[in-house]
UniProtKB/Swiss-Prot annotation:
Species this chain originates from: Buthus israelis
Signal sequence bounds: 1-22
Superkingdom, taxonomy of origin: Eukaryota
Tissues expressed in: Expressed by the venom gland.
SS bond list: 30-50, 36-55, 40-57
Annotated Gene Ontology cellular component terms: extracellular region
Record's protein name: Potassium channel toxin alpha-KTx 3.10
UniProt entry keywords in alphabetical sequence: Disulfide bond, Ion channel impairing toxin, Neurotoxin, Potassium channel impairing toxin, Secreted, Signal, Toxin, Voltage-gated potassium channel impairing toxin
Length: 59
C-alpha cells in the first residue's frame, strides 16, 4: 500500500511539473491573471495567468 501511495504522489508531482513548463508566453501585458483570459483564448489556449506582467497561456 505504501508503494501505491509513493507512485501516486510521484505521478502527481510529475504532472504538475509538466503543467508548469507547458506554458507559452505571449506578448500581452497584464496586471492580473484575469487580463489574460481573452488573449489566451484567442491564441487557442484554455488557461492563462499573469507572470512578470506578461501573459502565459497553457492548453
Amino acid at each position: 500500500m505504501k508503494v501505491f501511495f509513493a507512485v501516486l504522489i510521484a505521478l502527481f508531482v510529475c504532472s504538475m511539473v509538466i503543467g508548469i513548463h507547458g506554458g507559452v508566453p505571449i506578448n500581452v501585458k497584464c496586471r492580473g491573471s484575469r487580463d489574460c483570459l481573452d488573449p489566451c483564448k484567442k491564441a487557442g489556449m484554455r488557461f492563462g495567468k499573469c507572470i512578470n506582467s506578461k501573459c502565459h497561456c497553457t492548453p
